[in-house]
């Protein structure tokens, strides 16, 4: 006779990568059912945004998926710009793509190395945290903050990059690919690593689409869907890069896709730096973008624009729109309803991690208890965006 026992996993558990609580039903060590309990990190973000101006709402997006903040700022900024009917200057577009791809590498490095740590490989984490620190210093030099940058804003960027930062990023990338090769050497053909991930948490193409997957989790199942190619935004259309795709849809394929994406991100950043044009990084519209400090010292009108922008904000035309970007975790979308005032009437956030977490039960059934952290790590879930 089968005896089903219930086991609590989390919400404080080192393999949960956040405040995840799972109610697991086990037959011996085999998972029969898995029920995720969410909401431990709920902060009412969508409601808070309704009480802020469009500029004040921006920092909330940094705090959703706090591992890849600029990707979410990007989605929000593009959504607001679509409502305003403005296009940012070419230099701002190239710089946005550079920092969004740095964000993608930061995210994948953390996921790949902590995932390896979950299954027993410790070294890659220490090697790659040094590389992440260097990339966070690029964030800091551009925006003044290592994590919550608020750098990509509706209308452009907070500021231009300091002189020489583009060359610094380029020289870093030359050495970074060698470090990435070291991680691949340790993990990719490692028999223990493969034993823990191959055929674990398999999803077919049809199932992946039906479950609403996106990003590396979808592409690992063999679906070549990437918003940077299928619905290009900013300057992605003019860049040459491949879309890494898996074949089996298991945890090992998800690891391989993320590793390949980091190499592609390096290619994208190099192309953007080579093509980086001169020019402004904000739109020439003082209702949306602030005037320069120099201009404010000589023009009363510029000073008034600055005061109005940071006290009242700008009024966005009435309407509604949805904009999605290819964030490191998948399709991150922002839906905004504007009533013509300076604050969003409604802001709905589509977080890829929320969709992927729903599939954890399907992926884990009939696997062993020890396989659950391996599957969870392969989905790359951060609870800031899940709970919102």
From Swiss-Prot:
It is found in: Cell inner membrane. Pfam families: Complex1_49kDa. Gene3D superfamilies: Cytochrome-c3 Hydrogenase, chain B (1.10.645.10). Disulfide bonds: none annotated. Its EC number is 7.1.1.-. Keywords: Cell inner membrane, Cell membrane, Membrane, NAD, Quinone, Translocase, Transport, Ubiquinone. It catalyses: a quinone + NADH + 5 H(+)(in) = a quinol + NAD(+) + 4 H(+)(out). GO terms for molecular function: NAD binding; NADH:ubiquinone reductase (non-electrogenic) activity; quinone binding. PROSITE patterns: COMPLEX1_49K. GO terms for cellular component: plasma membrane. InterPro entries: NADH_Q_OxRdtase_suD, NADH_UbQ_OxRdtase_49kDa_CS, NDH1_su_D/H, NiFe-Hase_large. It is a peripheral membrane protein. Belongs to the complex I 49 kDa subunit family. NDH-1 shuttles electrons from NADH, via FMN and iron-sulfur (Fe-S) centers, to quinones in the respiratory chain. The immediate electron acceptor for the enzyme in this species is believed to be ubiquinone. Couples the redox reaction to proton translocation (for every two electrons transferred, four hydrogen ions are translocated across the cytoplasmic membrane), and thus conserves the redox energy in a proton gradient. NDH-1 is composed of 14 different subunits. Subunits NuoB, C, D, E, F, and G constitute the peripheral sector of the complex. This is NADH-quinone oxidoreductase subunit D. It comes from Neorickettsia sennetsu (strain ATCC VR-367 / Miyayama). The lineage of its organism: Bacteria, Pseudomonadati, Pseudomonadota, Alphaproteobacteria, Rickettsiales. The gene is nuoD.
């Amino acid at each position: 006779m089968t005896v089903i026992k219930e086991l609590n996993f989390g919400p404080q558990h080192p393999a949960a990568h956040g405040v995840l609580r799972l109610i697991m039903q086990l037959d011996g060590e085999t998972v029969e059912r898995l029920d995720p309990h969410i909401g431990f990190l709920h902060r009412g973000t969508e409601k808070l945004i309704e009480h802020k101006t469009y500029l004040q709402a921006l920092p909330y997006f940094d705090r959703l998926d706090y591992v890849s903040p600029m990707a979410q700022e990007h989605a929000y900024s593009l959504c607001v710009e679509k409502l305003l009917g403005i296009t940012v200057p070419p230099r701002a577009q190239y710089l946005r793509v550079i920092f969004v791809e740095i964000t993608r590498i930061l995210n994948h490095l953390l996921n790949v190395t902590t995932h390896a740590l979950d299954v027993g490989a410790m070294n890659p984490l220490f090697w790659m945290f040094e590389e992440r620190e260097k990339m966070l210093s690029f964030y800091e030099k551009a925006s003044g903050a290592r994590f919550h940058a608020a750098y990509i804003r509706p209308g452009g960027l907070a500021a231009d990059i300091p002189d020489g930062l583009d060359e610094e990023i380029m020289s870093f990338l030359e050495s970074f690919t060698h470090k990435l090769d070291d991680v691949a050497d340790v993990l990719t053909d490692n028999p223990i690593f493969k034993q823990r991930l191959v055929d674990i948490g398999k999803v077919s193409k049809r199932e992946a689409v039906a479950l609403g997957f996106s990003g590396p989790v979808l592409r690992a199942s063999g679906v070549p869907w990437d918003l940077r190619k299928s619905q290009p935004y900013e300057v992605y259309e003019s860049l040459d890069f491949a879309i890494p795709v898996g074949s089996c849809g298991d945890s090992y394929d998800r690891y391989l896709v993320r590793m390949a994406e980091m190499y592609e991100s390096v290619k994208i950043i190099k192309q953007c730096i080579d093509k980086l044009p001169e020019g402004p990084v904000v739109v020439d519209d003082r209702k949306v973008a602030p005037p320069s400090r120099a201009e404010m010292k000589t023009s009363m009108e510029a000073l008034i624009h600055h005061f109005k922008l940071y006290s009242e904000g700008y009024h966005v035309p009435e309407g509604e729109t949805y904009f999605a970007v290819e964030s490191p975790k998948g399709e991150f979308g922002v839906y905004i309803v504007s009533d013509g005032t300076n604050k969003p009437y409604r802001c709905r956030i589509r977080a890829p991690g929320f969709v992927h977490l729903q599939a954890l039960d399907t992926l884990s059934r009939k696997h062993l208890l020890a396989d659950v952290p391996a599957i969870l790590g392969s989905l790359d879930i951060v609870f800031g965006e899940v709970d919102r």
